[in-house]
Structures are given as structure tokens and as C-alpha cells.
């Protein structure tokens, strides 16, 4: 009789997170929080998201359907859950952290065309599942620093029972077979609904969801019960019995006040200890030092500031998820609570509309985006804030709108972006040379932007250099358009400074007004929100929230008047020639 195959006890462990009953239960946050707990126990953890949609990546998807696109250091356009992973683990992930059906099928079909399958009939099993498995198992390889992860947490997108998810679930089942059951753990997130008329929590949906999972060969090792309240012990015992799961593996996770409370919720239910025990991982106590400090900043703020996010996609807040979290983290830095006001950019197209939307906020953030809709509203919001000394932070498209507004303020009345008006006589924002084919429709749109981390050099003693405490920085990007260098000198007459560029000096990366002209009006072509962490707020967001706190404090001073340079100044077309005067003689500081 052949000997049983032995699996090495030192092998990287694989933990799969699946979801049942309904979508949007918080699988990504559950996986991220468990990853944070294991990391706090001294383990090396990495994470991956399997998305069952046919798109190659979310880069060309509608923000209203998918939410934000999270860009990694290596330039991959990934699911927003990868942002949760990076923030909770406090580590950078690569493009391999997100796998889609589109990627898998593209790879398999390309291999078939090259003849790599040697004439085999290419099928979902084994070819598609093998491709998925190879990407899952590749996560266990050593990283760039040569460190092999102790645990790979893989979130399977979608809901058990969805036809699109079946190949991924089958691949996960086969991974368990290949690495050994002792090296694999399945965590299933399910809904336990509360029926108000009868006053009952119902377990039947969870039972059916687990039955569907078991029908394809996967028995969960633990269950996350999502509910708006604690699930009592008798119901947990019932679910454990009916779903054939250890009672210790039935975890009640009621809604938490903050997403950063979830690790504490899971720890209170001893999920992390159960996982460590089942996977035979080294047991160390959780080091709560850093996370407890974060939670004190979350729940015991000493100040509150109101920030307006002026955007196009505010009907789905997930479209600006990383921006919102970066703003909150900037608040944590100052022990301040950030109240978000979601302002539709269309509402700020007129001065009256901007005043109605922004008159009682302490800062304005202009996020990235694409297309002409709402652009004049973003420019209107910047103009309103510039004239009143209201702190502004512009990201990507936000920088471009700051530049357009500055150009118009010094008489370049037709200033616009080639993206919004290809025939504008004054394209102060122009198409990047290597992006012209894509913009003209002669090349693929997906995956062709300027993506990933790029360096920038900052002007010494500038606002941004002081925020970063450095003159050399690296930020992630996602854009096709740039500031037109032919207009730099004319735009500079507004007082706007080009305070950061690419190392060769060609590409404008940061703009700002001198603090004597405006206390904090800064734009960056990058997406700094993607590098912010709750425990390590991004310097630009921390500086922005600090400026908002100062603005609020100045508001409270009795009898305070606006400095002269912040008093709104209107220019007629007849004034335009006078705007060529030296800055100190001009009113264009507005």
C-alpha cells in the first residue's frame, strides 16, 4: 500500500475567504482585519483578490458600478479591496494581488494560440483552474526582499452560487488538495438577517449558503456571521451543528462603529487564535500598541473639521474610497474627526452655487476623474476657495483644474484642457506625447495610461517640501494629460508656483500658491491617497487637514476680517492687458 503523501509543516499556509447569501457583506474588510491580526502576531502575511468578472482589470469600468480603481506601485489597476489590504497590512502589494476572469482567460487563450497545450482540448477544468491555481500559489513565493509569507489570504469575489465564481472555488478546492488540508483554511462570510416583525435572527440563509459551498467540495473551517447585532450563543451552537463547523469557528461580527474596530471584534471572538491553532502557526500574543493608539485617535477626537469633496461620482462613495480614508487618516494625525461633505461638482458651476455648497466647510478636496461633466463646477469650487483663503487639495484632475483656474484668472479666458475641448485655443493642459494614440482611439484604453510609481523633485522650502520633509518623493499616478509647459510663465503671473516636477524638469507634478498669497492651495498630478495608511497618514493629507484646522480656528477669532489678498476681485475683459503687470502691482492674487 503506497505511503500517504506528507506536506511540509513549514509550508506557506493558504486562507480563503468566501461569501454567501448576498454581496457587500464585507469580505474584503474581514480578510484585511484578519490579516492585520496575524501581522500583529508577528507573521508575514500577503493578500490577493480573485474577481470573477470578464474585464481584464477595473481600469475601464464605470466608477458608479465598480467604485475606485486602486493603483499599485508597479502600475496595476486593481480592485478597491486591494486598497483595504494595503492599509490594514501596512505594506505595498503588486499587481499579482488582483486576478480577474479576464486575465485568466486572456492568458489561457494566448497559450493555446502559441501551441503550449500541445493540441489538448482547452477546457475550464483543468486549463482555466490550473491558471488560477498558478496565480494563487505564486503568492507564496518570496517577495523582492526574499521574504516568504507565512500566510496567503485569498478573497474570492462574488457570492457562492454565482456561476462566474465556480472556476475560482474549484481552483481553491484543488489548492487545498495540493498543499494539504493542514495548510489550508476556508473562512465563509454569511448573512444572518434580523426579522423585525417576529424579533428573530434567521439562520436558514447561512445553512443554505454552506450547503451550496459543500456541494462543490468545500467545507468551511469557520463562519463569519454578519448581522446588525450580536448573534447569541444558542444560535451560534445551532449554526455550528447544522453547518458542521466547530463552535469556536462560529464568529459573530455585528456592525462596528468604525472599520478599524473590526480587528478588535474578530479578536474578541478569538478568530485569530483559532486560525493559528488550526494551521499550526507560531503562537505569539497580538501587539496592540500601534492599533490601540489608532483607535484612540478614531474614537476620542479633540477637534472636528468639515471637508467638502467636490466630485462627479459622489452617488457612490466607494468611487472615492481611498481619498475618504486618507482624509480620515489625516485627521487622525491631528486627533481630529473629519466630517465629509459630498458635493456634486455640478453644484459649484456658479459663484452662488459654490457659496451655498462650501460656505461652512473648512477645506475643499478636488479628486481625480475623467470627462468633461462637472469640470466647470470643480473650477468654480477652486475659484471660490482661492478668493477666500479656504484650504484646497487637488489630486490628479484636481491639479489640472487648479492650473486652468489660475490661467483664467490672469486673462487666458479660453484656458482649458485638451481632454475637455480638443479645439481650445489655449490648451494649458495637453495630451502626453505617448498617450495621443489612445486619446485618438487608435490604441487600447485599458492599461495604457501613465500608471504606477514615479519620482518627483520638489522645490526646497515649498509648501509640499515642508509637508513631505523631503525634496525627493515618489507617488503613484494614473493619467494621460499634463500641464502644457508653453504656458508655465504666463500662469505663474497668477502667483501659482510649479513646486514639483519629474526629475528631468519636464512634467509638472506639484503646484501651489505661496503661503503669503493663499495659506494652503496645493495640487498634485499624483494620487497620494493610494499610499496613505491609518497608522501612517500621508504627509499631504496631514498638512491639508492641519490647514483646515487652522482655518477653522481663525474663523472663531472675534472680529476677524479676511486678509486683503483673499477679498474677491473681479476682472472684466478690459482689465486683461493690465494683468501683465508685475505680481506685486496686480490684483490677480484674488
Swiss-Prot record:
Which InterPro entries does the record match to this protein? Class_I_gatase-like (IPR029062), CTP_synthase (IPR004468), CTP_synthase_N (IPR017456), GATASE (IPR017926), GATase1_CTP_Synthase (IPR033828), P-loop_NTPase (IPR027417)
Positions contributing to UTP binding: 23, 202-207, 238
PROSITE patterns from the UniProt entry: GATASE_TYPE_1
Q: What is its EC number?
A: 6.3.4.2
Q: Where does L-glutamine bind?
A: 369, 397-400, 419, 480
GO CC aspect terms: cytosol
> Which region ranges are annotated with the description Amidoligase domain?
1-281
Gene3D superfamilies of this UniProt entry?
A: 3.40.50.880, P-loop containing nucleotide triphosphate hydrolases (3.40.50.300)
Record flagged with keyword ATP-binding: yes
- Keyword tags: ATP-binding, Glutamine amidotransferase, Ligase, Magnesium, Metal-binding, Nucleotide-binding, Pyrimidine biosynthesis
Q: Which residues bind Mg(2+)?
A: 81, 155
From the Swiss-Prot or TrEMBL record, what is one GO molecular function term?
identical protein binding
Say what the protein does: Catalyzes the ATP-dependent amination of UTP to CTP with either L-glutamine or ammonia as the source of nitrogen. Regulates intracellular CTP levels through interactions with the four ribonucleotide triphosphates.
Q: Describe the protein's quaternary organization and the partners it interacts with.
A: Homotetramer.
- What family classification does the UniProt entry report for this protein? Belongs to the CTP synthase family.
Q: What is this protein called?
A: CTP synthase
**Native organism:** Mycolicibacterium smegmatis (strain ATCC 700084 / mc(2)155) (Mycobacterium smegmatis)
Organism classification, top ranks?
A: Bacteria, Bacillati, Actinomycetota, Actinomycetes, Mycobacteriales
The primary gene name is: pyrG
Amino acid at each position: 500500500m503506497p505511503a500517504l503523501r506528507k506536506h511540509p509543516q513549514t509550508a506557506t499556509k493558504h486562507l480563503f475567504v468566501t461569501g454567501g447569501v448576498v454581496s457587500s457583506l464585507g469580505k474584503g474588510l474581514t480578510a484585511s482585519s484578519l490579516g492585520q491580526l496575524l501581522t500583529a502576531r508577528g507573521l508575514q502575511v500577503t493578500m490577493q483578490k480573485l474577481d470573477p468578472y470578464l474585464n481584464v482589470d477595473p481600469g475601464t469600468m464605470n466608477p458608479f458600478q465598480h467604485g475606485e480603481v486602486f493603483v499599485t506601485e508597479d502600475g496595476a489597476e486593481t480592485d478597491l479591496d486591494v486598497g483595504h489590504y494595503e492599509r490594514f497590512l501596512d505594506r505595498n502589494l503588486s499587481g499579482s494581488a488582483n486576478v480577474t476572469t479576464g486575465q485568466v482567460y486572456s492568458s489561457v487563450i494566448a497559450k493555446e494560440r502559441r501551441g503550449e497545450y500541445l493540441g489538448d482540448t482547452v477546457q475550464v477544468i483543468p486549463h482555466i483552474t490550473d491558471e488560477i491555481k498558478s496565480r494563487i500559489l505564486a503568492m507564496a513565493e518570496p517577495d523582492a526582499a526574499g521574504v516568504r509569507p507565512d500566510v496567503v489570504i485569498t478573497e474570492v469575489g462574488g457570492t457562492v452560487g454565482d456561476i462566474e465564481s465556480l472556476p475560482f472555488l474549484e481552483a481553491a478546492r484543488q489548492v487545498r488538495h495540493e498543499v494539504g488540508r493542514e495548510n489550508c483554511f476556508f473562512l465563509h462570510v454569511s448573512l444572518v438577517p434580523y426579522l423585525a416583525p417576529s424579533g428573530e435572527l434567521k439562520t436558514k440563509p447561512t445553512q443554505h449558503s454552506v450547503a451550496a459551498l459543500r456541494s462543490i467540495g468545500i467545507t468551511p473551517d469557520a463562519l463569519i456571521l454578519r448581522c446588525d447585532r450580536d448573534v447569541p450563543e444558542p444560535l451560534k451552537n445551532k449554526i455550528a451543528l447544522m453547518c458542521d463547523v466547530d463552535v469556536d469557528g462560529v464568529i459573530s461580527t455585528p456592525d462596528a462603529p468604525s472599520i478599524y474596530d473590526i480587528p478588535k471584534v474578530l479578536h474578541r471572538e478569538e478568530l485569530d487564535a483559532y486560525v493559528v491553532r488550526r494551521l499550526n502557526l507560531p503562537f505569539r500574543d497580538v501587539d496592540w500598541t500601534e492599533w490601540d493608539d489608532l483607535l484612540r485617535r478614531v474614537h476620542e477626537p479633540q477637534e472636528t473639521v468639515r471637508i467638502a469633496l467636490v466630485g462627479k461620482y459622489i452617488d457612490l462613495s466607494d468611487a472615492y474610497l481611498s481619498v475618504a480614508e486618507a482624509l480620515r487618516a489625516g485627521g487622525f494625525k491631528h486627533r481630529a474627526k473629519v466630517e465629509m461633505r459630498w458635493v456634486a461638482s455640478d453644484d459649484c458651476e456658479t459663484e452662488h452655487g459654490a457659496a451655498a455648497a462650501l460656505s461652512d466647510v473648512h477645506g475643499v478636496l478636488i479628486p481625480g476623474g475623467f470627462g468633461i461633466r462637472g469640470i466647470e463646477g470643480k473650477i468654480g469650487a477652486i475659484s471660490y476657495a482661492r478668493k477666500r483663503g479656504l484650504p484646497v487639495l487637488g489630486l490628479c484632475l484636481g491639479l489640472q483644474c487648479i492650473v486652468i483656474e489660475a490661467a483664467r484668472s490672469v486673462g487666458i479666458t479660453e484656458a482649458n484642457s485638451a481632454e475637455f475641448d480638443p479645439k481650445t485655443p489655449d490648451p494649458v493642459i495637453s495630451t502626453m506625447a505617448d498617450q495621443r494614440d489612445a486619446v485618438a482611439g487608435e490604441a487600447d484604453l485599458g492599461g495604457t495610461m501613465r500608471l504606477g510609481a514615479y519620482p518627483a523633485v520638489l522645490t526646497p522650502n515649498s509648501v509640499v517640501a515642508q509637508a513631505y520633509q523631503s525634496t525627493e518623493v515618489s507617488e503613484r499616478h494614473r493619467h494621460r494629460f499634463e500641464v502644457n509647459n508653453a504656458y508655465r510663465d504666463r500662469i505663474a503671473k497668477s502667483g501659482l508656483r510649479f513646486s514639483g516636477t519629474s526629475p528631468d524638469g519636464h512634467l509638472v507634478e506639484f503646484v501651489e500658491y505661496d503661503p503669503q498669497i493663499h495659506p494652503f492651495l496645493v495640487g498634485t498630478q499624483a494620487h497620494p491617497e493610494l499610499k496613505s495608511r491609518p497608522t501612517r497618514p500621508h504627509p499631504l493629507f496631514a498638512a491639508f487637514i492641519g490647514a483646515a484646522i487652522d482655518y477653522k480656528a481663525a474663523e472663531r477669532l472675534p472680529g476677524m476680517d479676511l486678509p486683503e489678498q483673499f477679498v474677491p476681485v473681479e476682472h472684466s475683459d478690459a482689465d486683461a492687458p493690465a494683468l501683465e503687470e508685475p505680481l506685486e502691482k496686480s490684483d490677480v492674487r484674488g
